[in-house]
Amino acid sequence: MPHHYILTLFGLLPVATNISTWWNFGSMLLTCLALQTLTGFFLAVHYTANINLAFSSIIHIIRDVPHGWMMQNLHAIGASMFFICIYIHIARGLYYGSYLNKETWMSGITLLIILMATAFFGYVLPWGQMSFWAATVITNLLTAVPYLGTTLTTWLWGGFAINDPTLTRFFALHFILPFAIISLSSLHVILLHEEGSSNPLGTNPDIDKIPFHPYHSYKDLLLLTLMILSLLIIVSFFPDIFNDPDNFSKANPLVTPQHIKPEWYFLFAYGILRSIPNKLGGALALVMSIMILLTIPFTHTSTMRSMTFRPLSQLMFWTLVSTFITITWAATKPVEPPFIIISQVTATLYFTFFISTPILGWLENKMTNHP
């Protein structure tokens, strides 16, 4: 067996024989990242980070730049595809106990936070009506920070309101953060292969491993092909499926949209924020909705790694999935009954999963006569 590091990393990497399709999403995320970086570069070449020209420059890209419409749609819909893959990737980690590889899990959650920041900055760049107001509402949450809030907000905005300096710095951040994501992704993969992937049974896979290439690389290729095919179908036939109608109008600080909401992939966190009728409480809940994922490796009490043989934990996991979908749906609705109570119930259920996990693990140990 040759001992060349690159060959070992990509070809002769030993992987468990029984890993399922749920393990394909890492390579799909890598493809999404490559696609976003490439299309983002071509868009940045033609984009102008100025509040008077940004909206027009997007129209110029779509209408006048050769294949500009495709680059713009691939970048916008590619972001949605990125988040679909990352949420499934995290759900897989929660279900199969991948979080017990602590360093990999921590680097992954850090990646998620940077990715969400990058996507938020990107959403502001077209300078459409919803871009402007979503940026105003979300950045305004910084004012909830005691003592430092107003100073922090003014510092982020580069003035006393969202204006040209804000757009310029958001563009700079949106351009530079993907490089941080690329470097951290490399670290994420290196940390993963220190210990190796887990598997659906949650057992030690060392007794039965096969080379990554050709076995798992071809398996990855199938789902990658389906993802790219889906992406191209949406780009070609339904390019505006994820767009907000308000964002087809140029930003107007004097007209507030009837219902301000971010992109769909932030709606679960936005729904949790809205469910608390207090600015600081809502901002804390918003941050905690992501940060609570960091606690999972330390609250695992079950003797079994995976949820495959843990019916109570499975029930809570699928409750979490349905809760996530319900919060996302409720956050698209206006703040009025019955959506207020739906948001509050689902937000409570969301956090209940993380609180109940250690209790259920302990209970399942008792049921299976483990100490």
UniProtKB/Swiss-Prot annotation:
Keyword match DNA repair: no
Under InterPro entries, the record lists:
Cyt_b/b6_C, Cyt_b/b6_C_sf, Cyt_b/b6_N, Cytb/b6-like_sf, Cytochrome_b, Cytochrome_b_C_euk/bac, Cytochrome_b_N_euk/bac, Di-haem_cyt_TM
Its required cofactor(s), as named, are:
heme b
Note on how the cofactor is bound: Binds 2 heme b groups non-covalently.
Gene3D superfamilies named among the record's database cross-references = Cytochrome Bc1 Complex, Chain C
Q: Name one GO molecular function term.
A: metal ion binding
Location (main, coarse): mitochondrion
Question: Any stretches that span the bilayer, and where are they?
Answer: 25-45, 69-90, 105-125, 170-190, 218-238, 280-300, 312-332, 339-358
Which positions in this protein are listed as binding heme b b562?
A: 75, 174
- Single GO cellular component term: mitochondrial inner membrane
Any one biological process term the GO annotation gives: mitochondrial electron transport, ubiquinol to cytochrome c
Give the way it sits in the membrane: Multi-pass membrane protein
Positions of heme b b566 binding: 89, 188
Q: Name one Pfam family in it.
A: Cytochrom_B_C
The job of this chain, per UniProt, is described as: Component of the ubiquinol-cytochrome c reductase complex (complex III or cytochrome b-c1 complex) that is part of the mitochondrial respiratory chain. The b-c1 complex mediates electron transfer from ubiquinol to cytochrome c. Contributes to the generation of a proton gradient across the mitochondrial membrane that is then used for ATP synthesis.
Its quaternary structure?
The cytochrome bc1 complex contains 3 respiratory subunits (MT-CYB, CYC1 and UQCRFS1), 2 core proteins (UQCRC1 and UQCRC2) and probably 6 low-molecular weight proteins.
Q: What else is known?
A: Heme 1 (or BL or b562) is low-potential and absorbs at about 562 nm, and heme 2 (or BH or b566) is high-potential and absorbs at about 566 nm.
Classification via PANTHER family = CYTOCHROME B (PTHR19271:SF16)
- Name listed for the protein in its UniProt record: Cytochrome b
